[in-house]
A protein has these predicted regions:
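Short beta-strand segments that buttress and anchor functional surface loops
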Residues: 7-11, 33-37, 112-117
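Extended lipid/amphipathic-ligand handling interfaces
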Residues: 22-26, 48, 100-104
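An acidic-aromatic
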Residues: 27-83
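A short, Trp-centered hydrophobic/proline-enriched beta-strand micro-motif
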Residues: 1-15
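Non-transmembrane domains of secretory- and envelope-associated proteins
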Residues: 97-163
Length: 163
């Protein structure tokens, strides 16, 4: 199963608040790509494949390489879900451990999802456009280009994208 979509995401937790337009694609099992577009190109490109996650900040020439776990995604994005659990949320399946989940359905896929994550963070994702079983290039889930970029940790990565 694959998915490609454009979302408006609002995330609120005791330590973080943010809103963003997100371009997101996934292919099961275990492949996720997320981009935060900016005025001159992507501000952030996140690719998770199997057990590895890359977060590339083209404008900052910075890269984070870490595990593709719920803990690492929480440290980076504030979302304590695995890549496959993010996929579940977007196709209308409540992952185990969510405190609350509500999907407002379009004809085939949810058009809006509201969830309270295991850590209490509240996530609202409004789907602007989405396609299920999208024809995605395998290269979409390759390690993003980052030759010559400096290595950063999750706290610096979070600071870079959330400012």
């Amino acid at each position: 199963m694959s998915y490609s979509g454009t979302l408006r995401v609002d995330l609120r937790s005791p330590e973080f608040r943010g809103r963003a337009r997100v371009l997101l694609a996934f292919r099961r099992p275990g492949a996720l790509r997320l981009e935060l577009p900016g005025p001159t190109g992507s501000r952030l490109v996140v690719v998770a494949r199997q057990d590895v996650l890359w977060a590339v900040f083209p404008g900052e020439r910075a890269v984070l390489r870490t595990g593709a776990t719920a803990k690492e995604l929480q440290a980076l994005l504030g979302v304590a879900l695995t890549p496959d659990e993010i996929a579940d949320v977007l196709v209308g399946v409540a992952p185990k451990g969510l405190l609350r989940y509500e999907a407002r359905w379009g004809s085939i896929l949810p058009r809006e999802v509201r969830a309270t994550l295991p850590d209490g963070a509240r996530l609202v994702a409004k789907v602007e456009d989405a396609e299920i079983d999208a024809a995605l290039s395998p290269a979409a889930f390759d390690e993003p280009a980052h030759d010559g970029f400096r290595a950063i940790d999750a706290s610096e990565a979070r600071r870079l994208w959330s400012r």
